[in-house]
């Protein structure tokens, strides 16, 4: 359950380490975001020489949440951390590698490039 001011770790190699959520996309009054949802965020921590800089406003898709997500078969999935992958203007990942597992819900939301780069899809 990601909302405004939520901080997320970054699960790719763009150079950002942490982002802070500015807005959840998908409706004017939308409050929460879950797996596969797109957010607008600002980079709070980044490594020197990376593709993104601290203070940059980016779009990102959520790939892991601590809050459990219910699946259509009745099972639940949750992760140890909240994490996201930074997107470019076309909705594709800006990085070339994804670290850690990602939720299967990304396949339903048509983020196939992230699914193919991820080491594990749960």
From Swiss-Prot:
Keyword Ribonucleoprotein listed: yes
**Protein name, UniProt field:** Large ribosomal subunit protein uL14
Q: Which GO terms describe its cellular component?
A: cytosolic large ribosomal subunit
* Superkingdom field: Bacteria
Q: Write the record's keywords in alphabetical order, separated by commas.
A: Ribonucleoprotein, Ribosomal protein, RNA-binding, rRNA-binding
Q: Report the HAMAP family cross-referenced here.
A: Ribosomal_uL14
What does the UniProt function comment say about this protein?
Binds to 23S rRNA. Forms part of two intersubunit bridges in the 70S ribosome.
Q: Which SUPFAM superfamilies match?
A: Ribosomal protein L14 (SSF50193)
